[in-house]
Amino acid sequence: MRSLSRTDQVISSLDKALSTVFAAHSASRPAPKPAVDPGLAMTPQDKSLSASLMRVNHVGEVCAQALYASQALGTRNETLRAQFEHAAREETDHLAWTEARLAELNGRTSWLNPLWYAGAFGLGLIAGRLGDAASLGFVVETERQVEQHLLQHLDRLPVADVESRAIVAQMREDEARHAAAAEHAGAATLPVPVRWMMRGMAKLMTSTAHRI
């Protein structure tokens, strides 16, 4: 299979950005669909809370697409590029699932998705410039933070919202696997100040996306 030229890779990254932010998405795997207990009815308040939380999760997947796209662009290691691209395809499932669930809840995606994508893409490029080990370390830390964030959402999502809870649980399982794969590929441990900075940026994103 012919390797893409640098120009082709940049064009592909631009196309990925536009499709992630503006296009509808299809999943390669069906969304988890648990049996619904007819005795568990969601109130309007439940739906509003779930929509806000799933919007935050959707933003997280927009950022994941940007991170993996930029890191795939930054590495010259074809095996590592393939790993990033595979993880991005799984994250596309998450993007499609959260998007569809938001529609079911009469919610909406974040108005700031172009900004979230651009910021995450820039961070991924910086990580990529620091070398493959640092780039993989960035993946590990990101996925661990997302995994913890999803666990917190499982505590906050209404008990009656079994559909959203099933989606978030599967997403958390996938994120843990992505972190483990990055560790196995040779991830470096990021300095503590960098991890703190990443947590601060993630907190800003989640608190903003919860509302807009």
UniProtKB/Swiss-Prot annotation:
GO CC terms = plasma membrane
GO BP terms: namely:
ubiquinone biosynthetic process
User: Which GO molecular function entries does the Swiss-Prot or TrEMBL record give?
Assistant: 3-demethoxyubiquinol 3-hydroxylase activity; metal ion binding
Recorded hits in InterPro entries, A to Z, give: COQ7_proteobact, Ferritin-like, Ferritin-like_SF, Ubq_synth_Coq7
Q: How is the cofactor bound?
A: Binds 2 iron ions per subunit.
- At which positions is Fe cation 2 bound? E91, E143, E175, H178
Which keywords annotate this record?
Answer: Cell membrane, Iron, Membrane, Metal-binding, Monooxygenase, Oxidoreductase, Ubiquinone biosynthesis
Top EC class for this record: oxidoreductase
Q: Which cofactor does it need?
A: Fe cation
Binding-site residues for Fe cation 1, renumbered to this chain: E61, E91, H94, E175
Q: In which pathway does it act?
A: Cofactor biosynthesis; ubiquinone biosynthesis
Catalysed conversion reaction: a 5-methoxy-2-methyl-3-(all-trans-polyprenyl)benzene-1,4-diol + AH2 + O2 = a 3-demethylubiquinol + A + H2O
What is the topology of this protein in the membrane according to its UniProt annotation? Peripheral membrane protein
Q: Where in the cell is it found?
A: Cell membrane
Per the record, the similarity remark reads: Belongs to the COQ7 family.
Q: What does this protein do?
A: Catalyzes the hydroxylation of 2-nonaprenyl-3-methyl-6-methoxy-1,4-benzoquinol during ubiquinone biosynthesis.
Protein known as: 3-demethoxyubiquinol 3-hydroxylase
Species of origin reads Methylibium petroleiphilum (strain ATCC BAA-1232 / LMG 22953 / PM1)
